[in-house]
Amino acid sequence: NYGAIGVVIGHEMTHGFDDQGRNFDKDGNMNNWWTDEDAAAFKAKTDILVKQFDAIEVLPAKEGQPAIFANGALSLGENIADQGGLRVARTAYRNSLAGREAPAPIDGFTPEQRFYLGYATLWAQNIRDEEIARLTKLDVHSLGKWRVNATLRNLQDFYDAFSIADGPMFL
């Protein structure tokens, strides 16, 4: 459940520090409380995230229609929250195991792997191309497929959990 509900809770907490939430202080007042250095580092990281999502082809070109790409700027706050939510939930899960024997694998998957499988299952969806196009243009949330694949690509612990070696498919 840490990979699912834990991530959702961490996601909502992270909104307090995303591209919008970062503009409010501890009392909820709009206030630039970040140092110039912190703001510059945040912008550099979020620019990378925007470019990563902008490069995602959500629908290929067909029948005279151009390909449709994700909109990294539109979905930035949610993508930041997905990144943060995963990290918060992973830390909470590991803290819950402190001083305890690690749970046994289930169906051949380690507890760490099951954490990420729980996350992927949370965002599983089956939608028509027309809805993919509509959501990509209007929704501040990335499509479920990309909430998983594009988010996990930035998390070294995911690669470690599944023993993914550096190679041509390594992101």
Describe the role of every protein-language-model region.
Residues N1-G6, G16-L171:
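Zinc-dependent metallohydrolase catalytic domains
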